[in-house]
Amino acid sequence: MPITKAHDRYMRILLEHIGESKYPSGELMDRVEILLDRDHVDDYLEILFEKVEADRYPSKQLLDRIARWTLAAS
């Protein structure tokens, strides 16, 4: 369960922006990762996986973030 409804709403907004952006900013992803809770980890990783799968040459930054969070979530 999210910490608060406001936290959940804020996270959904940020995740939506990351998902819609072809090249999401590192600052925006850093902000999400600082506030990331168990309820949003899978959603965040799914967005990152979709971006990596859709790009022939995915960014090292996205790959590093996926690696970090898949290890942290295990």
Residues covered by each model-derived region:
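N-terminal acidic leader/helix
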Residues: 2-35, 57, 64, 71
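Amphipathic alpha-helical scaffolding segments comprising HEAT/armadillo-like alpha-solenoid repeats
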Residues: 11, 42-49
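Alpha-solenoid HEAT/Armadillo-like helical repeat scaffolds in large eukaryotic proteins
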Residues: 17, 50-51
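Short linear motifs in low-complexity or flexible loops
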Residues: 38-39
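Non-catalytic interaction surface on structured domains
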Residues: 46-49, 67, 73
